[in-house]
Amino acid sequence: MCIPCFTTNPNMAAKCNACCGSRRGSCRGPQCIC
């Protein structure tokens, strides 16, 4: 879990990746998962 995310926002994937650092982040449900 990293930051809250919204699947309707096309920029969330990039924000999840940035929040997770080198690990690939993904937006699942209400949270970014690392």
From Swiss-Prot:
It is found in: Secreted. One of its GO terms (cellular component) is extracellular region. InterPro entries: Scorpion_toxin-like_sf (IPR036574), Scorpion_toxinS_Cl_inh (IPR007958). One of its GO terms (molecular function) is chloride channel regulator activity. It comes from the Eukaryota. Disulfide bonds join 2-19, 5-27, 16-32, 20-34. It holds the Pfam family Toxin_5. Keywords: Chloride channel impairing toxin, Disulfide bond, Ion channel impairing toxin, Knottin, Secreted, Toxin, Voltage-gated chloride channel impairing toxin. The keyword Membrane does not apply. Expressed by the venom gland. PROSITE patterns: SHORT_SCORPION_CHLORIDE (PS51200). The keyword Ribosomal protein does not apply. Negative results: intracerebroventricular injection into mice does not induce neurotoxicity (up to 1 ug doses). Belongs to the short scorpion toxin superfamily. Chloride channel inhibitor family. The presence of a 'disulfide through disulfide knot' structurally defines this protein as a knottin. Toxin with unknown function in healthy organisms. On glioma cells, interacts with chloride channels (probably ClC-3/CLCN3) and MMP2 at the surface of glioma cells. This complex is then internalized via caveolae, thus inhibiting the chloride channels necessary for cell shrinkage and tumor propagation. Inhibits migration and invasion of U87 glioma cells expressing CLCN3/ClC-3 voltage-gated chloride channels. This is Chlorotoxin-like peptide AaCtx.
